[in-house]
């Protein structure tokens, strides 16, 4: 199935669907070993205590594009009820097998709001969900998904502070 927004470097290819969910992660060969298998990796937003997964069915207005003359995504996600607009830029490093995401949040409310982002991974490492393992590394404050010789490290950085604050595996 064609995807709406692909980014990659020849060794790592990531495809997004029309609702800005990751659906395919090909590594180390483009077109072979899809570690997502078409299953969505969701992205969620909580404003104060009101939570929504990103997607048109959840009330999001979604505009997908690339930054001019680049393979850097520029997705604009607006939710009127939550009162926020997110500008999300994604890229795969040109030389390394690294996927990066930058999220800028604009609050449309008259008062300050607590905004939390949620990243949900649903790996099918080596094209099978059997034997996938996820573990939290407290020393580095990262989550690692692995099976066999394939490892995927998940990390975040907020205001120059690296590390995952909350996580769940299972």
Specify the residue positions occupied by each region the protein language model found:
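Terminal accessory carbohydrate-recognition/targeting modules of carbohydrate-active enzymes
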Residues: 1-170
């Amino acid at each position: 199935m064609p995807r709406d927004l692909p980014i990659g470097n020849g060794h790592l290819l990531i495809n997004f669907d029309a609702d800005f969910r990751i659906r395919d992660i090909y590594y180390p060969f483009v077109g072979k070993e899809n570690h997502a298998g078409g299953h969505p990796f969701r992205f969620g937003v909580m404003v104060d205590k009101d939570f929504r997964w990103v997607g048109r069915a959840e009330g999001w207005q979604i505009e997908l594009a690339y930054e001019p003359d680049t393979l850097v995504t520029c997705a604009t996600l607006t939710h009127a009820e939550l009162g926020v607009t997110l500008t999300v830029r994604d890229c795969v490093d040109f030389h390394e097998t690294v996927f990066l995401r930058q999220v800028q949040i604009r609050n449309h409310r008259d008062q300050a709001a607590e905004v939390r982002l949620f990243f949900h991974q649903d790996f099918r490492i080596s094209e099978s969900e059997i034997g996938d393992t996820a573990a939290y590394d407290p020393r580095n404050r990262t989550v690692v998904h692995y099976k066999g010789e394939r490892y995927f490290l998940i990390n975040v950085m907020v205001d120059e502070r690296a590390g995952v604050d909350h996580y769940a595996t299972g």
